[in-house]
Amino acid sequence: TPQARQLMSIYFATTALKKDSGVADPAVQPRPVRKIGVLGAGLMGAGISYVTAGKAQLPVRLKDQDAAGLNRGLAYIDRLVQKRLYRRSITAFEAGQERRRVTPTLDFSGFQNVDVVIEAVFEDLMLKQRLVAEVEAHCLPTTIFATNTSSLPIAQIAEAAQRPENVIGMHYFSPV
């Protein structure tokens, strides 16, 4: 039937799109991501850390400006893990692994070997530009700075960067 042909066409087109990297040059390959840094332990930063530790199973270094903020972020992550444990969607062992993947810090210790830093602080251009400069000072030259901004132009945030080509936008919409 025509409907069946259209449904099959949609299926094959969707499958083909999943395989498309968006880069025409086959010599260009993605770099591996082994460790993530997250700036800001608020609701968004903690949610990004939780999703990264649980779904991607990557270690996350979570930084905030004060211990109270870090503790709130870690408590939020723990509540999310506990909820999954209660629903038996993960085991106690898996819950422990997820919790251990997120390590807190008040400074940039542990950021020297992260592949991507995701910034999840409030919408303040000068703050985000300062964070770009700090990340470049404490991380590898290849580290990607991914801003989670929803309203500021990425180009303006990248103006403070020594390596603006490493500044990207990566918006999470309610990660949990």
Give residue spans per PLM region.
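Glycine/serine-rich phosphate-binding loop and adjoining beta1-alpha1 elements at the start
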Residues: 1-35
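N-terminal Rossmann-fold NAD(P) dinucleotide-binding loop
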Residues: 45-46
